[in-house]
Amino acid sequence: MPATRRRYSGEAEVSGLPSFELRPGVAFPDWAAVTSPAAVDALTAILSAFDLAKNWSGYDDEEDRVRQAVIEGLAELDGGPDAEWIAARTGLDEGRVATLLGRLAARDLVVRDGGSNAIVGAYPLTTRSTEHRVGFGGKVTHAMCAVDALGTGAMFDADVVIESRCRACGGPIRIATKDRGIALDSVEPEPTVVWSGNRYEGACAATSLCTVIAFFCSEAHLEEWQGANHPGAEGCRLTPDEAMQVGRALFAPVLTHAAGAVGRMA
């Protein structure tokens, strides 16, 4: 992981758009990252699905610390973190960590296995195999969806290489970032687009919303897939850059601090 992190500018709060203070000086989402009307629409739909006001009400510093540790563990550990690892990482008692993990799962910020109760994800990352592989820092992990993959670099302040597949034909899609994860360096194939669908069920985005946010190698393949699988479904067609804007807005604030603060990650 990078030794130093980009400081958060504090410019994310935009009047009239849903936002809350994630930690002092850091607003979620970072609306300053979103410049395209289509990206604004997609981000607004995602926040509406998650019910920002309800599900984030009362979110506190201990939950924030545990959530950060879970995400860092998903990036660092092959099998993901457990309560013991998180306790060592955060300095919190293991019993307290267990309670906080339950609260985060209820908010749909941590995803657990229905049988073993093991941690299997925290947006944007998951231990489960998905079509979105994200490589950085000598490690490869999986992202929940296309937007999550595109936001991972900004979250970790690192350039990433995304290897995914067209949801329609299965053809390979490769995207590389630059400027420490906040801009696109290359997109192959060039006509690649992202579909950001609207579907939230069972209080779990990983098994609903994330399944309809995907890469397509061309607009024609997106249209074919929609016609065959989701005719009339609501959502937004995004360019890779627009989808990255949404990913940055959602995930750049997750591990960062306000300008002038000391970075959390070592």
Positions of PLM-derived features:
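Short acidic, hydrophobic short linear motifs in intrinsically disordered regions
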Residues: 76-90
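Short, cationic-aromatic polyanion-contact patches
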Residues: 57-63, 114-137, 179
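Short cysteine-rich clusters marking metal-coordination/redox-active sites
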Residues: 166-169
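Short alpha-helical segments that sit at the start of domains
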Residues: 37-68
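Short amphipathic alpha-helical interaction segments
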Residues: 91-106
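A short, conserved structural fragment
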Residues: 105-116
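Long, low-complexity, charge-rich intrinsically disordered regions
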Residues: 2-38, 141, 158-161, 172-266
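Short, amphipathic alpha-helical interaction segments positioned at domain boundaries
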Residues: 122-159
